[in-house]
């Protein structure tokens, strides 16, 4: 008799994705982040669902309802902080996952990569609208500043902003629709993640060497299920350390002040995971130029397969490209730091130089270095 997991229509899908899936025998811990992102998403949907049971999306009561969750709801405080810090863990895993893709040349799986870039945009949109919901000072002013960027679009900009706001400023209508967006987007992310996996399983996983691994495959279960469980336990450990010992470490103190349209905070800045893009936006002293640079900083990922000039897929055996990659990582950390600093000397010039370097490394230095490496190997 054939095993039910191989015949049952539903279990067959699960079996082919998580049990009998042929996986390369040498994938490292950098390949753990896909499953960790799945766990983060499930965790965010569950904690978010319980928060939504007590949250009210009205300007008069939103801030109070979040306070009520923390003070009066059974274990509301832990649910709220798991959700807030879960977003940070989500982005840490995302950045690691994308970084892995860049380092090991996983972007040559075009469909998987492009869906991944769409996923990145969707997660960023979800995090942005979610940050507005507690209706603190930074929520309100963050929403005002970021939505206002759309007014840089010629001709239709102003109308577009007012249409998104549902009025002439960020107000009750804006908060209500942002809550609706924040509720629906995670389910869209889950659907996109399934498509992402579908395309990945068409080709099979990449591996650190970048060499096809068809000759050396092992079953996903038990080898990588146990490895993923270890990753998940570590993820939960780090998340709970953050939640229980330093829940406000990554937040902004201004968001504990209720939103006040008449009082602007001294430094308007987004959550830490958007600071690198915010620094690129601020480094251009022109509104439309800044918006284009902001979008380009993420959209540039779509160009990665076109910019790949090396005859090797992975960076594992390319020391010069490795150097450039880690300079790019350092540059992104610099941009993250600058994004949280006030707009004054010397931060302005550092931000501008770091922004130029970011685009210069990706668009010029990496393709040129890859070509030089090809020539050094007489390829």
UniProtKB/Swiss-Prot annotation:
Q: Where does heme b b566 bind?
A: 97, 196
Details of cofactor binding: Binds 2 heme b groups non-covalently.
Q: Which GO terms describe its cellular component?
A: mitochondrial inner membrane; respiratory chain complex III
One short Pfam name that applies is Cytochrome_B
Ligand binding (heme b b562): 83, 182
Instruction: Return the InterPro entries for the record.
Output: Cyt_b/b6_C, Cyt_b/b6_C_sf, Cyt_b/b6_N, Cytb/b6-like_sf, Cytochrome_b, Cytochrome_b_C_euk/bac, Cytochrome_b_N_euk/bac, Di-haem_cyt_TM
Q: Which spans are transmembrane here?
A: 33-53, 77-98, 113-133, 178-198, 226-246, 288-308, 320-340, 347-367
Alphabetical keyword list: Electron transport, Heme, Iron, Membrane, Metal-binding, Mitochondrion, Mitochondrion inner membrane, Respiratory chain, Transmembrane, Transmembrane helix, Transport, Ubiquinone
Cofactor(s) of this protein? heme b
Q: How does it sit in the membrane?
A: Multi-pass membrane protein
Keyword Transport listed? The answer is yes
At which positions is a ubiquinone bound?
A: 201
Q: Does the keyword Heme apply?
A: yes
Where does it reside? Mitochondrion inner membrane
GO annotation terms (biological process): mitochondrial electron transport, ubiquinol to cytochrome c
Q: Which PANTHER family match?
A: CYTOCHROME B (PTHR19271:SF16)
What interactions and quaternary structure are annotated?
Answer: The cytochrome bc1 complex contains 11 subunits: 3 respiratory subunits (MT-CYB, CYC1 and UQCRFS1), 2 core proteins (UQCRC1 and UQCRC2) and 6 low-molecular weight proteins (UQCRH/QCR6, UQCRB/QCR7, UQCRQ/QCR8, UQCR10/QCR9, UQCR11/QCR10 and a cleavage product of UQCRFS1). This cytochrome bc1 complex then forms a dimer.
Q: What else is known?
A: Heme 1 (or BL or b562) is low-potential and absorbs at about 562 nm, and heme 2 (or BH or b566) is high-potential and absorbs at about 566 nm.
* Function in brief: Component of the ubiquinol-cytochrome c reductase complex (complex III or cytochrome b-c1 complex) that is part of the mitochondrial respiratory chain. The b-c1 complex mediates electron transfer from ubiquinol to cytochrome c. Contributes to the generation of a proton gradient across the mitochondrial membrane that is then used for ATP synthesis.
Family as reported in the entry's similarity comment: Belongs to the cytochrome b family.
Q: What's the protein name?
A: Cytochrome b
User: What phylogenetic lineage does the species belong to?
Assistant: Eukaryota, Metazoa, Chordata, Craniata, Vertebrata
Question: What is the name of the gene encoding this protein?
Answer: MT-CYB
